[in-house]
């Protein structure tokens, strides 16, 4: 099903936490890249509460996990798996859509697509990384880290 947001193919289903972020960027600065970077930082901060190091990569939107436990890519670089996808749309500088974080989805559902159009990398989840984290645990971590990345606006 096609939707009007950034990004290419992805999968949404049970076991993912979808977060639709609606913020007025007229009041926070009309900078789409800074907004996406803040979304990524928000997820990275939340993952850090579970001692999981999420990372961003130039040219690839989303949050990535280095996988030294997997075979290297053909070019010798370390394999990385995506744990969170980001797809946003702006209308009159108000954001729509947002992020999806893999908590415990059936990762087999990704087999038929190239997630977000990025070749050579896989997909992971909190549970796949050996963390017994539930939706409620992630929700608390996201709540705690939100204001660090999206500070309240004055008056």
Curated annotation (Swiss-Prot):
User: What stretches pass through the bilayer?
Assistant: none
UniProt binding sites for substrate: 5-12, 85-87, 98-100
What keywords sit in the KW lines? Acyltransferase, Cytoplasm, Transferase
Site entry: Lowers pKa of active site Cys: 82
InterPro entries xref list:
aa-tRNA-synth_II/BPL/LPL (IPR045864), BPL_LPL_catalytic (IPR004143), Octanoyltransferase (IPR000544), Octanoyltransferase_CS (IPR020605)
Record has Cytoplasm as a keyword: yes
Report the catalytic activity.
octanoyl-[ACP] + L-lysyl-[protein] = N(6)-octanoyl-L-lysyl-[protein] + holo-[ACP] + H(+)
Task: Give the highest taxon in the source lineage.
Answer: Bacteria
What pathway is it annotated to?
Protein modification; protein lipoylation via endogenous pathway; protein N(6)-(lipoyl)lysine from octanoyl-[acyl-carrier-protein]: step 1/2
Where it sits in the cell: the answer is:
Cytoplasm
Q: What is its main location?
A: cytoplasm
Q: Which GO terms describe its biological process?
A: protein modification process
Residue stretches making up the BPL/LPL catalytic domain: 1-154
| Signal peptide feature range | none
Broad class of enzyme this protein falls into: transferase
Q: Which GO CC terms are listed, alphabetically?
A: cytoplasm
Q: Where is the active site?
A: 116 (acyl-thioester intermediate)
EC identifiers of the protein = 2.3.1.181
Q: Report a single Gene Ontology molecular function.
A: lipoyl(octanoyl) transferase activity
Q: Which family does it belong to?
A: Belongs to the LipB family.
Task: Tell me, in a sentence or two, what this protein's role is.
Answer: Catalyzes the transfer of endogenously produced octanoic acid from octanoyl-acyl-carrier-protein onto the lipoyl domains of lipoate-dependent enzymes. Lipoyl-ACP can also act as a substrate although octanoyl-ACP is likely to be the physiological substrate.
Q: Cite any additional comment in the entry.
A: In the reaction, the free carboxyl group of octanoic acid is attached via an amide linkage to the epsilon-amino group of a specific lysine residue of lipoyl domains of lipoate-dependent enzymes.
The protein's name in its UniProt record = Octanoyltransferase
Top-level taxonomy:
Bacteria, Pseudomonadati, Pseudomonadota, Alphaproteobacteria, Rhodobacterales
């Amino acid at each position: 099903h096609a939707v009007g947001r950034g990004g290419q193919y992805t999968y949404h289903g049970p076991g993912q936490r979808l977060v639709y972020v609606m913020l007025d960027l007229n009041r926070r600065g009309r900078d789409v890249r800074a907004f996406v970077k803040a979304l990524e930082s928000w997820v990275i901060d939340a993952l850090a509460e579970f001692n999981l190091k999420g990372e961003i990569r130039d040219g690839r939107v989303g949050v990535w996990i280095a996988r030294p436990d997997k075979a290297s890519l053909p070019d010798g670089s370390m394999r990385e798996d995506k744990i969170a996808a980001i797809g946003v749309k702006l209308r009159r500088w108000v954001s729509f859509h947002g992020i999806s974080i893999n908590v415990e989805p059936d990762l087999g559902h990704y087999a038929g697509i190239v997630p977000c159009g990025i070749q050579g990398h896989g997909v992971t989840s909190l549970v796949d990384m050996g963390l017994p984290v539930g939706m409620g645990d992630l929700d608390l971590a996201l709540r705690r880290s939100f204001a660090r990345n999206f500070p309240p606006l004055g008056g």
